[in-house]
Design a protein with these regions (language model features):
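Active-site loop-helix segments enriched in His/Asp/Glu that coordinate
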Residues: 109-111, 122-151, 170-179, 198-202, ...
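Divalent metal-dependent hydrolysis catalytic cores, especially in the metallo-beta-lactamase
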Residues: 84-95, 105-130, 158-164, 186-193
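Mid-to-C-terminal alpha-helical segments outside catalytic/metal-binding sites
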Residues: 2-11, 19-114, 145-153, 175-178, ...
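Short acidic, glycine/proline-rich loop/turn micro-motifs
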Residues: 127-130, 254, 368
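Short catalytic/ligand-binding loop motif for oxyanion handling, primarily in non-cytosolic enzymes
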Residues: 18-21, 26, 115-117, 123-129, ...
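Catalytic pocket-lining loop regions of alpha/beta-barrel enzymes
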Residues: 138, 157-160, 165, 170-171, ...
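Histidine-centered catalytic micro-motifs
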Residues: 11-18, 220-224
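N-terminal-biased segments
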Residues: 32, 36, 40, 47, ...
């Protein structure tokens, strides 16, 4: 297929790095290093695995020392591949996966101006260690300092790595947000799901959101470990002690990806966060988009039914029609296999982000392969999706 030529250089909203084994320990305070660190150790079979102290971690237990090539799953995700054919793995120490100057050279070859840079392991460890709150905060700050070392928050105005933020401790979250903002961060990664008994839009967290709004930082709700396997899947009789490789189909459907993302975004809208902070922006990254039309229809319905005939004004804390609030404040990066045209029709080209998920195997082999999914868009809409929306979020 011959793709149309572009009169602009795209900006990718979803690139990843593969972390080295010392991503949490390099800068970890000494008192946490024995027994309270996210680290790599050998299991009984002699294989490397991620552990917290002596306990094997959950979702991302195996280390990603060898990974499948970029786009390796694309035929399978498109319904055309043979699931029994496994591509040959490549080392995660491949220089462009680990080193920012090599990645910039890769961006040049790929025809990409800039990118949001995101973790692979880093989006998975919060839920594993949240019971030890002090250790969670220490490991997360240490991880962010590794990101600052190896990638930077606005490196050469082309690589925009996002730090991790947890809301389990509001005051810590405010302090860490201020620290990374001072170092040039343009946004942060927020784990999907509730904050262990609270909505992320609970007014308790308003000091944090006020600082995020003031600094102009985008909140990226990236696919990750939401905790649903523990408190939702368990109630359906599912084993809560699973890894990425051992999750059941039911767990993938109900506890991972789209479901926690929808719930999180609905909570931000219905719990009134955007009414209290009207300049906040949220980006849903690597959660897909096929669920967006149904969610907006449901938001419109509950905005009418729950408020007018069921629970009164308190049924929703949103002061405007919820589906309109979503369209104003939420940006969505679809999967390549999603119906991107439907998404544009639903929320407008001004809220759709091009994200390649490179170099993950479930993404595209080369970032601009994504053009195959959007090449029929009008020129102005195409530029919005492929460049301008992300440029505005990053303040490029």
């Amino acid at each position: 297929m011959v793709m149309r030529s572009l009169d602009f250089v795209p900006i990718d909203a979803d690139n990843h790095y593969y972390e080295p084994h010392d991503c949490c320990t390099r800068h970890l305070e000494a008192k946490f290093r024995n027994g309270r660190a996210c680290h790599v150790a050998k299991n009984a079979e002699g294989q490397d695995e991620w552990r917290f102290g002596d306990r094997p971690m959950g979702f991302h237990r195996p280390t990603r020392d060898w990974v499948l090539p970029p786009g390796a799953y694309r035929p399978f995700m498109s319904g055309k591949g043979d699931p029994n054919e496994v591509p040959k793995a490549i080392p995660s120490e491949t220089p462009t996966f680990r080193h920012r100057d090599v990645r910039i050279a890769t961006l040049d070859k790929q025809g990409i101006e800039a990118t949001i840079m995101l973790p692979s392991f880093g989006v998975a460890f919060e839920d594993d260690i949240h019971a030890d709150r002090e250790a969670l905060l220490a490991n997360m700050r240490a991880f962010n300092r590794y990101v600052e070392d190896d990638w930077g928050y606005a490196y050469r105005n082309r690589i925009f790595a996002l730090p991790l933020i947890t809301l389990v401790d509001r005051d810590w979250a405010v302090a860490e947000l201020e620290r990374v903002a001072a170092l040039g961060a343009r946004g942060f990664i927020l784990r999907p799901g509730p904050v262990y008994g609270r909505s992320p839009a609970d007014p308790h967290f308003d000091p944090f959101w006020a600082r995020a709004e003031e600094a102009g930082l985008v909140a990226a709700v990236h696919i990750g470990v939401s905790g649903y396997v523990q408190f939702f899947g368990r109630e359906w009789g599912e084993d809560p002690n699973v890894t990425e490789q051992t999750m059941t189909a039911f767990q993938f459907l109900t506890c991972f990806g789209a479901r926690p993302a929808q719930d999180t975004l609905a909570a931000l809208v219905l719990h009134g966060l955007f009414d209290r902070f009207p300049r906040l922006r949220v980006a849903s990254i690597e959660n897909g988009s096929d669920w967006v039309p149904a969610l907006l229809k449901n938001l419109e319905k509950v905005g009418r039914v729950a408020i007018t005939s069921q629970g009164g004004a308190k049924a929703s804390l949103a002061k405007r029609p919820p589906h309109e609030v979503f369209r104003e404040h939420v940006f969505v990066a679809p999967f390549f296999e999603d119906d991107v045209y439907q998404l544009v029709d639903t929320i407008g080209a001004e809220r759709v982000l091009f994200g390649s998920d490179w170099p993950h195997p479930e993404g595209v082999a080369a970032p601009l392969d994504f053009l195959e999914e959007v090449e029929k868009l009008p020129a102005a809409a195409l530029r919005r999706v492929m460049r301008d929306n992300t440029a505005e979020l990053l303040r490029i």
